[in-house]
A protein has these predicted regions:
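Conserved Radical SAM active-site core
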Residues: 19-150
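PDZ-domain C-terminal substructure recognizer with occasional recognition of PDZ-binding tails
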Residues: 2-29
Length: 150
């Protein structure tokens, strides 16, 4: 993998990184940088474990991340509902992979119902666009009895 890094003065460095598929990239960001403002989830999933947590825990446990940068860097799963077409194009352009996607169902109407997000069904078009571009994806589902088990 080759990373192109642009320094604040405009100088560009190409860094070659050799790693196994399952290994972390090994990149850490300083405070005040790229990863300060994580994107929070806009869904209200019927199965969300964060919504089911007891009160009184530390605040960081209640943060619902849905950030594609965390998927690529840390292996977090995203629903694609918080990603713009620009975000998808950037993943394709820079070939950022693998991206981990929380799918739940391929039925757009059922996906909207499960995620309580009227735009959740549109994310399947983004999934297809990533597939067509050859982006490696890992998928997961939360199986809800009587809802998405067929």
């Amino acid at each position: 993998m080759v990373l192109l890094v642009e320094k604040p003065d405009g100088e560009e460095w190409e860094l070659e990184v050799e790693k196994e598929y399952e290994e972390d990239l090994g990149i850490e960001f300083e405070n005040g940088g790229l990863m300060d403002d994580y994107r929070s989830c806009s869904n209200k999933c019927m199965f969300c474990f964060i919504d089911q947590m007891p009160p009184g825990m530390r605040d960081t446990l209640y943060f619902k991340d849905d950030d594609s940068r965390l998927s690529f860097i840390q292996g977090n799963y995203v629903t694609l509902t918080n990603m713009s077409d620009h975000d998808i194009d950037r993943i394709i352009r820079y070939h950022l992979e693998p991206i981990n996607i929380s799918i739940q169902t391929m039925n757009p109407e059922l996906r909207c119902k499960m995620l309580h997000n009227r735009f959740a069904g549109d994310a399947l078009k983004k999934l297809q666009k990533l597939y067509d571009a050859g982006i490696t994806m890992n998928g997961q589902i939360v199986l809800c009895k009587g809802v998405n088990e067929r």
